[in-house]
């Protein structure tokens, strides 16, 4: 294998698309907090100082979507009218209806739920980082989280909510990360901050603490390459739910079936099966059965079991792949109801997933990030 490079990006919680993801998942959580069986499919669009929320919700919860949206926007940091978008003055329109009875016909099938839609879903894990995530997306998220911490903590008081990061990692001929070739940080900032202060602050509070050990003299470091990023967030760009799929998942290091996560309850396999696929793949790698693992699942609307369960290990497996695939099928529940129960997805936990990635965040209490099936998996494999 020849050496190659991989580039992944991340965005902060104030990015317009992420604002939408968090509003959609905030509304989902508000429903689940009162009604764990709520059916929710909510999309959000933000543009300028306007928010449009649309979708289908069937629930017994007493929902105030407008209030929830304003709370999310304020928590992100858009509370000042000077930003051009703020929680107090933004205009919010809603168009929320109940779930189509034709869809419900396929989902509500007695004790065992059917899939809310068809889809192909992928989960991935590798041994490049402690969280078993690819190194590029791990670094990119780390930089974005440092930006957010520096803003919320007042370390860099001139930071504003919007921001993006990107890293390029070079891999050696054996597929191991060997060098960081490029780091890009673009962050919204107050009008009055001078460039020298901005660059020094980002280097000292964001870049060095996160990837300092990877920096070499030849590493290319770019901070606000255009020179100015004052207008940002929804005041600068329109945002829509579900437009940061690679940021949400593996930074382009694994396949993606195309279905977004945010705003969808757990009967939607776009979300639930992607989480279960990650859970399975992560346990395979944690068990030492492969260095890299991708689990693929496919579902038909109304059916409770998958049409396909496939395991790809890219030649890094330590046991026969057919044997490993059989063990994955036996160890993990892939029915819709089984996945919901195993991952405890009736809880209001989803807003936490809506920024900085759905995977690799082991301190958030997500069941799909646990490696608690390693022993069971190895036992089924006869190890």
Curated annotation (Swiss-Prot):
SUPFAM superfamilies: S-adenosylmethionine synthetase. Pfam families: S-AdoMet_synt_C, S-AdoMet_synt_M, S-AdoMet_synt_N. Its main location: cytoplasm. Transmembrane segments: none annotated. Mg(2+) binds at residue 17. Pathway: Amino-acid biosynthesis; S-adenosyl-L-methionine biosynthesis; S-adenosyl-L-methionine from L-methionine: step 1/1. Homotetramer; dimer of dimers. This is S-adenosylmethionine synthase 1. The gene is metK1.
